[in-house]
């Protein structure tokens, strides 16, 4: 395959050639609260960069993905998806492409918008019954996260709750190929999976080097039919990934470069994609934006926007991207008390195209973008109740994503942020 002549692009990761290096220290960098040192004369600390070993981009790359699955030797796969993907015919298209490569296909299509422990267990039953040697997820973060949970249990055993936190597994998961249909979560290329525990109404954050797909596929043609509301929510999710990664205590020059380019692309193209889903330039660039944001937070991790948003999604069932959109400016206003974070928010203002390069300008532009893409900006409009704050705060403070926030807030401070977003 000639990359220069191909209508799609391929990105390979050095991780496939040096796996011991890329599985060694990145997690330690953010669980220990590693501080950004780009402006210091001290030597940079040892870090690593996680990315799937094989990534496909561009119109028409879906067919190439099927060939790559065949070349990897897989013969019996489970497709994990949701009813919406079935309805629009994308499942049938992928199934046909795989069957052309003599790959047997099984289906689990029960994934919910916030995938649950029950979803994971149902999919796992099919994997065991059919003795699948691989999995393919089709969709956005919900399908990919659910598939990661299934794949992890297929090889490691136990319950999915056993893997909440950071690097709790001991074995690589069942090989997973992730076909992405939204420009936001970047779950097709990260080591993060978020699973809802139905009985406790909380979201469990699983951050594990073994959950990364072996192949990610971003074919913009699969995104053209995405409705405006979902385009807006997933796009704001991508922006949140980039902003949180940039102010993270585990940021490094590589994640910084990915984050700021993501911020620029979202600022330029998200509203266009929301206004006209058939705008190919906007869709293509949002696909790149979400992948860049994924590379940033997959290695620098996140912060309290996600730690808090997970609780809103688990408790009320609010779409994840909407939660992030509403909380992003409020959490960053709190973070701006930290001098380093304040300066970095000024950088973000520059990349958002603001005339003034200040934290305040960045927050104003973020709030403006939320309105431009027609997301309701207040939690009260989404059904959030102040009487639930204490429970939400308790769970947010236990969320692994908060470990790299610029400031570790108190219970009362997290509660105040929730209140400010009402």
Curated annotation (Swiss-Prot):
One MF term in the entry's GO annotations: metal ion binding
GO cellular component, one term: mitochondrial matrix
Co-factor requirement: Zn(2+)
EC category: oxidoreductase
Pfam families named among the record's database cross-references: ADH_Fe_C, Fe-ADH
Factors inducing expression: Induced in response to zinc deficiency.
GO biological process, one term: glycolytic fermentation to ethanol
Residues annotated to bind Fe(2+): 237, 241, 306, 320
Catalytic reaction list: a primary alcohol + NAD(+) = an aldehyde + NADH + H(+); a secondary alcohol + NAD(+) = a ketone + NADH + H(+); ethanol + NAD(+) = acetaldehyde + NADH + H(+)
InterPro entries assigned: ADH_Fe/GldA, ADH_Fe_C, ADH_Fe_CS, Alcohol_dehydrogenase_Fe
Transit peptide start-stop: 1-29
Family in the record: Belongs to the iron-containing alcohol dehydrogenase family.
Name this polypeptide is given: Alcohol dehydrogenase 4
Species of the source: Schizosaccharomyces pombe (strain 972 / ATCC 24843)
Underlying gene: adh4
């Amino acid at each position: 395959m000639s990359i220069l002549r191909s209508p799609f692009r391929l990105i390979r990761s050095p991780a496939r050639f040096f796996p011991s290096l890329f599985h060694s220290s990145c997690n330690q960098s953010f669980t220990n609260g590693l501080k950004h040192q780009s402006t210091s004369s001290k030597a940079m600390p040892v870090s690593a960069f996680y990315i799937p070993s094989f990534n496909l981009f561009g119109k028409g790359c879906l067919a190439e993905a099927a060939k790559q699955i065949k070349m990897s030797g897989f013969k019996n796969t489970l497709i994990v998806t949701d009813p919406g993907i079935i309805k629009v015919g994308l499942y049938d298209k992928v199934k046909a492409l795989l069957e052309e490569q003599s790959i047997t296909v099984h289906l689990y299509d029960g994934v919910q918008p916030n995938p649950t422990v029950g979803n994971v267990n149902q999919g796992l039953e099919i994997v065991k019954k059919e003795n699948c040697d691989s999995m393919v997820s089709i969709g956005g973060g919900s399908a990919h996260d659910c598939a990661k949970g299934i794949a992890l249990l297929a090889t490691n055993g136990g319950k999915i709750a056993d893997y909440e936190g950071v690097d709790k597994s001991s074995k690589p998961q069942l090989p997973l190929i992730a076909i992405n249909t939204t420009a936001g979560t970047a779950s097709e290329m990260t080591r993060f999976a978020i699973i809802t525990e139905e009985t406790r109404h909380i979201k469990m954050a699983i951050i594990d080097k073994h959950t990364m797909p072996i192949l990610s596929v971003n074919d913009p043609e699969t995104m053209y039919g995405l409705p405006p509301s979902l385009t807006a929510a997933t796009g704001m999710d991508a922006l949140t990934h980039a902003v949180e990664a940039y102010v993270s205590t585990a940021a490094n020059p590589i994640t910084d470069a990915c984050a700021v380019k993501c911020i620029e692309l979202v600022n330029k193209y998200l509203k266009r994609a929301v206004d006209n889903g058939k705008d190919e330039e906007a869709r293509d660039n949002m696909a790149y934006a979400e992948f860049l944001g994924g590379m940033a937070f997959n290695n620098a991790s996140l912060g309290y926007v996600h730690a808090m948003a997970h609780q809103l999604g688990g408790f009320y069932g609010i779409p994840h991207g909407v939660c992030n959109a509403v909380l992003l400016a409020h959490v960053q206003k709190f973070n701006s008390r930290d001098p380093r974070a304040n300066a970095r928010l000024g950088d973000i203002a520059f990349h958002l195209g603001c005339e003034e390069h200040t934290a305040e300008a960045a927050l104003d532009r973020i709030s403006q973008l939320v309105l431009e893409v027609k997301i309701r900006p207040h939690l009260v409009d989404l059904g959030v109740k102040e009487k639930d704050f204490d429970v939400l705060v308790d769970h947010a403070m236990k969320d692994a994503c908060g470990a790299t926030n610029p400031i570790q807030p108190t219970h009362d401070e997290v509660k105040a942020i929730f209140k400010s977003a009402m």
